[in-house]
């Protein structure tokens, strides 16, 4: 279903992916340029601009690809201005939802680290158990929020409500989500594998191939997630 949706507007979809990824890389470049600058003021300015552009382009990329996936899954076409503009409350909700996910995963990791430290001190032979539980907890948080952008954009939920709906979806459909996870991980790993192969064939080619492959793969990932959301969302038949 996701691949069928991608055929609806291929130029818009991959053109948007290329532009958003380009801005994302520009943010990285500005931040890196600040490290080699002798002027403290200019270095601070470059760092601030880099972080700001990095964060804004990441949110724009996730929101845009999610909107495209939802629209194409419903058989609707989108226009460029619908992707380019800031959507006010929805965009803020999406940004806060992503922040909620990061903080929740960090909290789960911190709790797991504290439990591991305690068990390592008291029962060293069992120290692997809290480590495994911590990894499982972080993975569960991230997997439960796989549809967070779709919930915010499609159902116009608040960040906290979208988080709760994500947890509920995981509790009801965890076998389907676990089955989807290897495919998404394989798609995400594909650009890096191609980059390593290109670097082995010719020095200096790895980064360029990785970036180009990432531009191509990200819309496929977003379309797959959006198609899965349409099947598993509340009220879906």
Pin down the residues of each PLM region.
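Hydrophobic alpha-helical membrane segments
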Residues: 1-237
């Amino acid at each position: 279903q996701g691949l069928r949706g991608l055929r609806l507007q291929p130029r818009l979809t991959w053109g948007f992916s290329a532009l958003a990824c380009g801005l994302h890389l520009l943010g990285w470049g500005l931040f890196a340029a600040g490290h080699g600058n002798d002027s403290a003021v200019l270095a601070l300015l470059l760092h601030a601009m880099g972080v700001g552009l990095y964060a804004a382009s990441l949110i724009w990329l996730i929101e845009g690809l999610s909107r495209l996936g939802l629209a194409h899954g419903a058989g609707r076409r989108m226009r460029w201005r619908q992707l380019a503009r800031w959507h006010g409350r929805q965009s803020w909700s999406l940004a806060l939802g992503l922040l909620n996910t990061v903080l929740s995963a960090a909290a789960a990791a911190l709790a797991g680290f504290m439990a591991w430290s305690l068990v390592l001190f008291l029962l060293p032979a069992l120290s692997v158990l809290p480590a495994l539980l911590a990894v499982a907890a972080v993975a569960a948080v991230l997997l439960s929020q796989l549809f967070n952008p779709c919930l915010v954009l499609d159902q116009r939920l608040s960040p906290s409500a979208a988080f709760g709906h994500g947890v509920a979806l995981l509790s009801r459909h965890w076998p389907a989500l676990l089955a989807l996870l290897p495919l998404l991980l394989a798609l995400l790993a594909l650009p890096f594998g191609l980059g390593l192969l290109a670097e082995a064939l010719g020095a200096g080619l790895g980064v360029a191939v990785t970036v180009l492959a990432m531009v191509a793969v990200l819309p496929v990932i977003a379309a797959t997630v959006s198609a899965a959301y349409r099947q598993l969302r509340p009220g879906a038949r």
